[in-house]
Amino acid sequence: MVAAQDPPNAPHIPVLLEPILTRCAPITGTWLDGTFGAGGYARGLLEAGADRVIGVDQDPLALEMAADWAGDYGDRLRLVAGNFEALDAHAGGPLDGVVLDLGVSSMQLDRAERGFSFLRDGPLDMRMAQHGRSAADLVAEEDADMLADILFHLGEERAARRIARAIVAARAVAPITRTSQLAEIVASCLPRPKPGQSHAATRSFQALRIAVNDELGALVRGLEAAEGALEPGGWLAVVTFHSIEDRIVKRFFTQASGGAGRANRYAPETEDTPARFRLEPRKAIAPTEAEVAANPRARSARLRIGRRTAAPAMPADRAALGLPHLYTLTETP
């Protein structure tokens, strides 16, 4: 399931913050917010009693905007420029809790120049850290087969091959450099959405953003880093917004809680290992109707929480996590 993008000027409200604070109570010690964004989770943790919060974000703009209020918390809040995939290094010591919100923040969507949104015309960029290959580069350089694989595996777009062929045909006429260009190409390949349905370009934009930022590779590395950094009794709370991410997080926690993970029913079973996490609760937490009414962005969100045991950390069985067989998502950097 893919959530529609926020309407223009929608405020960024931390999703499922209350169940995180309630389930992980009492909030004490040192926490790391690996997707700092507008700082909603970090502030919530500090107000709930965390002694210290380390806010990590790879987007320079997020940290720049936080400068206006971060000083109010003194040395209780430390901001770090970087990706949460290396959160153990950013932490500089053991942690009592880690929070990851895997959605794109509203302040990124609201800025047309960042190129994340099909609702606003801007350069086709989509880079969180603002370096490396952009979405425009990817659209210009990859062949139709690779583009189709990206759209299908990372966006679950059923019309992936039709859209990929349309992109290749369009770029032969003129470079695709604007979000509006790409949105129009995608929309031309699909039926007009019914009222209440997501924009036709939602899945394609999601897929390109994930590919540009290697989001699934970073997610797996971040989950492993969190496992290694957390103290026994520490909490890992992960908020996802689409089924691909949620499947990976679910299977990671299944493995780490002592269950044998399998990539599919035909794969050989693996032996159970000592539980490194206890799931609290065992199933994902969905937002309440009241939260969705107050914050439509929360509609597709799912929260999974695990509590670290004293068992030694170990790498995840990546073949069993459900990672798409695409790019280098299963590779260790």
From Swiss-Prot:
Keywords per UniProt: Cytoplasm, Methyltransferase, rRNA processing, S-adenosyl-L-methionine, Transferase
Enzyme class: transferase
Recorded catalytic activity of this chain's protein: cytidine(1402) in 16S rRNA + S-adenosyl-L-methionine = N(4)-methylcytidine(1402) in 16S rRNA + S-adenosyl-L-homocysteine + H(+)
Compartments where found: Cytoplasm
Binding positions (S-adenosyl-L-methionine): 39-41, 57, 84, 101, 108
Matches recorded under Pfam families: Methyltransf_5
Chief location category: cytoplasm
Gene Ontology cellular-component terms listed: cytoplasm
SS bond list: none
Enzyme Commission identifier(s): 2.1.1.199
GO BP terms, alphabetized: rRNA base methylation
Entry keyword annotation includes S-adenosyl-L-methionine: yes
GO molecular function, one term: rRNA (cytosine-N4-)-methyltransferase activity
Record family assignment: Belongs to the methyltransferase superfamily. RsmH family.
Function: Specifically methylates the N4 position of cytidine in position 1402 (C1402) of 16S rRNA.
PANTHER family with a match to the protein in the record: 12S RRNA N4-METHYLCYTIDINE METHYLTRANSFERASE, S-ADENOSYL-METHYLTRANSFERASE MRAW
Protein name: Ribosomal RNA small subunit methyltransferase H
Organism of origin: Dinoroseobacter shibae (strain DSM 16493 / NCIMB 14021 / DFL 12)
Gene name, Swiss-Prot/TrEMBL: rsmH
